[in-house]
Amino acid sequence: MFLAQPRGFCAGVVRAIEIVERALEKYGPPVYVRHEIVHNKYVVESLKAKGAIFVEELSEVPPKAVTVFSAHGVARSIEEEAAARDLPVLNATCPLVTKVHNQGKRYTSKGRTLILIGHAGHPEVEGTMGQVPGPVLLVQNLDDVAALTLPPETPVAYITQTTLSVDDTKDIIVALSKKFHDIEGPDTRDICYATQNRQSAVRQMSKLVDLILVVGANNSSNSNRLREIGTEAGIPSYLIADGSELDPAWLDGKKAVGITAGASAPEVLVDDVIEALRRIVPVTVSVLPGREENIEFVLPAELATA
């Protein structure tokens, strides 16, 4: 059995969870969180047990209650609603998501029409589209690019959802560059390091295994993409929440299993999957070499000394 490296929690997820935990310590429960803090049921249930209450709308938050915005970011209208209600807010938006917001604002301030490459309905996409003033055109695939009716001479710029890697977006960016004569976009070094690193690790691991298990939630965009990458490499790949979802039939005829985890999946769930495998077959675990991650994001000032 091989473990991909890196895997699991990224710095933005660690920061978001710590914000909720420190808020509970400093202010006491309940602390209200708009949307799942990260897309993982285990994490959400663990925080619920400590006193966090998860809501989808601010109208569900009582007056004066401490409120946390999830790692995915929110639209300006949500920020304005919270301010109008005088809710004490802790913003757990990933700093790399905030960076995308700021890039979009800079492009539109220069008079460019903004194109967002991302998944419709994803909370990060909804937040980004609501943060940038003016219209934002969402494209999910090459067909969406072909359907754009802007004149070719229109000054445009593009930004991308952070859970999409350079590899995920390169074909769309090429198509946009062919369609529009005046186009700007962020440096490829600006993409989310965690997305790129985890996808690259799965591609490398796929050369060594004949089965890939991705630990993560069904509603986790980056976890789903890791499974897709394994499948694209020709390796049977499955997304599972924990060891209870492991199907012994998947192991029939398999000699080497690879395990990775989405950016919002804690290592305890990886351990759970390994134990589930051990109950079926003898297991020797090897951690693959990979890019080391030492990035940390600062907490909001209100919690820095909590």
UniProtKB/Swiss-Prot annotation:
NCBIfam families annotated for this entry? ispH_lytB (TIGR00216), PRK01045.1-2 (NF002188), PRK01045.1-4 (NF002190)
Q: Which cofactor does it need?
A: [4Fe-4S] cluster
The answer to whether the entry has keyword tRNA processing is no
According to its UniProt record, the EC number is 1.17.7.4
Biological processes, Gene Ontology terms = dimethylallyl diphosphate biosynthetic process; isopentenyl diphosphate biosynthetic process, methylerythritol 4-phosphate pathway; terpenoid biosynthetic process
Q: Which residues bind isopentenyl diphosphate?
A: H39, H72, H122, S220, S221, N222, S264
* Chemical reaction(s) catalysed: isopentenyl diphosphate + 2 oxidized [2Fe-2S]-[ferredoxin] + H2O = (2E)-4-hydroxy-3-methylbut-2-enyl diphosphate + 2 reduced [2Fe-2S]-[ferredoxin] + 2 H(+); dimethylallyl diphosphate + 2 oxidized [2Fe-2S]-[ferredoxin] + H2O = (2E)-4-hydroxy-3-methylbut-2-enyl diphosphate + 2 reduced [2Fe-2S]-[ferredoxin] + 2 H(+)
Stated name of the protein? 4-hydroxy-3-methylbut-2-enyl diphosphate reductase 1
